């Protein structure tokens, strides 16, 4: 590995350990020429994943787009950034585990909503209203009613 300070080609590995929940290897290295210590990360290169949009266009999977949508939907809500990043991680892992080269925005949106409804119902409704593009109030009200029914069925008082 080339030293970032003196550009010498040889360095030795001082320490190696797993990073990023086992998805990467972190290595501490020392340059054999100038003794400068630096860190490198080794990751598996994921095959490009294409997203098929509703209009048929294809573009590369973009975690940041999902995160931006979550941030907008959770604005002024008690949802931590770490929780939103975890949703994005979950969605990406689920999509990549399918083993497909292409995935629809419909499936990605459903995965996001499955995680978001359990985190914050208001953020879920905001996300769903943009994602599902409700055509009229009755569809929107049905979505709200589904959340209310789910909340009632999962509350401790509903076991009586």
From Swiss-Prot:
Cofactor: Zn(2+)
InterPro entries, alphabetized: ATP-cone_dom, NrdR-like_N, RNR_NrdR-like
Keywords: ATP-binding, DNA-binding, Metal-binding, Nucleotide-binding, Repressor, Transcription, Transcription regulation, Zinc, Zinc-finger
Free-text cofactor note: Binds 1 zinc ion.
Highest taxon above the source species: Bacteria
Annotated ATP-cone domain residues: 49-139
Residues in unnamed zinc fingers: 3-34
A matching Pfam family: Zn_ribbon_NrdR
GO molecular function, one term: zinc ion binding
GO process annotations (BP): negative regulation of DNA-templated transcription
Presence of the UniProt keyword Transcription in the record: yes
Similarity remark: Belongs to the NrdR family.
Role description: Negatively regulates transcription of bacterial ribonucleotide reductase nrd genes and operons by binding to NrdR-boxes.
Cited HAMAP family: NrdR
Protein's name according to its UniProt entry: Transcriptional repressor NrdR
């Amino acid at each position: 590995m080339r030293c970032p300070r003196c550009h010498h080609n040889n360095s030795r590995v001082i320490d190696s350990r797993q990073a990023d929940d086992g998805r990467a290897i972190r290595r501490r290295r020392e340059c054999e020429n100038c003794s400068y210590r630096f860190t490198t990360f080794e990751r598996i290169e994921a095959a490009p994943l294409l997203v098929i949009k509703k209009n048929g266009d294809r573009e590369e999977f973009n975690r940041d787009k999902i995160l931006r949508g979550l941030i907008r939907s959770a604005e002024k809500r008690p949802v931590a950034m770490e929780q939103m990043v975890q949703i994005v991680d979950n969605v990406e892992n689920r999509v990549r585990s399918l083993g497909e080269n292409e995935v629809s925005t419909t499936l990605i949106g459903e995965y996001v909503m499955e995680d978001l409804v359990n985190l914050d119902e208001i953020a879920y409704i905001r996300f769903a209203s943009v994602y599902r593009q409700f055509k009229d109030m009755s569809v929107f009200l049905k979505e709200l009613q589904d959340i209310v029914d789910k909340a009632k069925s999962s509350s401790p008082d509903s076991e009586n």
